[in-house]
Amino acid sequence: MPPKRDPRFNLGLISFSGLIEGIAAGTIFISLPYSVSSLPEGELFSDWAETSRIGFLISSFGLAMFFGQLLAGRMARNIAPRRSIAITGLAACAASTALLVLAASFPQLVLLRIIQGLSLALVIPTTASLLTAYSGPSSRGSALGFFSSAKTLGLALGPLAGGILIGYFGKENLGAVYGLGAGVILLACVPFFFLPSPGLTVNPGGSPGKQTDTSQPNQSSRGSPLFNPGLALGAFVAASCATTLPVFQNEFANRLGLDSFGIAVALSSMLLTRFLVSWPVGRAADRIDEHRLIYAGLLFLAGSTFLLGLAVSFPVLLLARIIMGIGMALFSVPALRIVSGDPESRNHTFRISLLTAAFSCGVGIGPLLTGLCADRFGFVTPFICWSLLSLATAAFISSRQRKTEASTSGAPPGGKPDLSEVSEPVAAGRKTTG
């Protein structure tokens, strides 16, 4: 029987893979608008403005991830070990990234981004499920926050690396950037080969032991619904707010006189801030009600998105993106912690995939709506709309939470609340008193 390994080592492997993949994704992401500008539009998109084509490219990737994550969540219920799904997704993403070198028109670029989205969709919910399987109930928020920090650091460093590479090779030689990105994504597969099958979990004391039930004493797996509409709407809106800058990347560059490295700094600033904040937020989510953090995150997103639309200088643009990074961390880590309860449940990965798919739906539809809104009503309008939607989403989640508390407080003395009426789970892994 092989010796039991410290689960923190497994968490480190997964986080290292996320860091590497994030660097590659960020490098590719900043390069794509330049490909859109240089490649022929194709007959189908000949009447589309460049901004609309960039928005459509981002949307196609996000929608592919949306549908792919629903499939990945279902696959993880029947395929073991789950790490094989992640390896398959990363390998397919590397292949499609390498093929970007051969893209000769905008439609081909869209097709390859769809394949990339479907490939990465296999990785995201599977990775989150593995993280919760390797972490204990009292440290689940910290584990998710640490991985989020590592992945976000990669996404932040990626645009910086991409800006440097584009400056070195030139905008006419993006094939070198895509080729390097494909190689880095393949490297991200390696840590998964060293992961054991996720049959062990960590008890609250932090030592490995046999698999235990980490659900709450008064809460079965049915107490965590498969779909949480409030958090799903929040994920959609958060992603839409975060993608406003990429949609107007070229416009901001022209308005503020920024080169490719300046845009890279603006893109990375949100991600670097999220990197710094995610782990502390995860630790806080292990100790206080996650909803308080979620409300704060949506308020930060509303203010930063509005400020971004009014940016008339690079410092204001940078400040808006930094505030947005804080908001993204305050929303995403606690929301993921809420849906990651009951790791032994057969629907665990699928429940996570529904939240991550909602975020990908925002990445997919949000930029398209942003571009269309700007074309019809002006540049500032989409920023105002997403700000108001962030505030409305916070109010919606708060309303649902109050209804949940009212229904649970109405349970008979000494009895249990009707779990079918509980719309949102109690903070996963936290002991309750009855």
Which sequence ranges carry the predicted segments?
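Helix-loop boundary and gating motifs at the non-cytosolic
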Residues: 7-57, 242-252
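Central cavity-lining transmembrane alpha-helices of secondary-active solute carriers
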Residues: 56-73, 268-279
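Helix-to-loop junctions at the C-terminal end of transmembrane segments
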Residues: 68-81, 277-289
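C-terminal membrane-cytosol helix-exit motif in multi-pass small-molecule transporters
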Residues: 182-206, 393-402
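Helix-loop-helix hairpin linking two adjacent transmembrane segments in secondary transporters
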Residues: 147, 151-193, 376-384
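Helix-breaking motifs and short loop linkers at transmembrane-helix boundaries and internal kinks
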Residues: 80, 102-104, 289, 310-312
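Structural signature of the two symmetry-related core transmembrane helices
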Residues: 84-98, 292-306
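Intracellular juxtamembrane helix-capping segments at the cytosolic ends
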Residues: 122-135, 330-343
